């Protein structure tokens, strides 16, 4: 299958446009910009973001539960979206789901505070477990072995 140079250029424009749409949603949407912040200046197809108010690994796990597989980052704790053509077609849905997940996580934080457990309750999801343990290790060289073991376990049938 060939799309030619014009098809390639069109795909690139679509991907960069969708990435920009995600970035602007995080920056401009009042439901997101109080809790999320974009890391750096996304120029092409990857948008990374973090939060000072919510556990980003819980956000990643909640997005995963909605069918999105965003990539967790460790230092700083963050998430990134690698925009591809399939994402372009559903970018508006991704943003709607991200808003919903942020609202759900904010509500969980409110409940934790009301219950006297304090803000930023313990992260409980898969991403939180992996990155929380890796981030707490004083010797970072063991992280490669940890990640390898995690992936082996995750993908064994």
Model-found features: residue ranges?
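Conserved small-domain helix->loop->beta segment predominantly found in fold-type I
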Residues: 3, 7-82
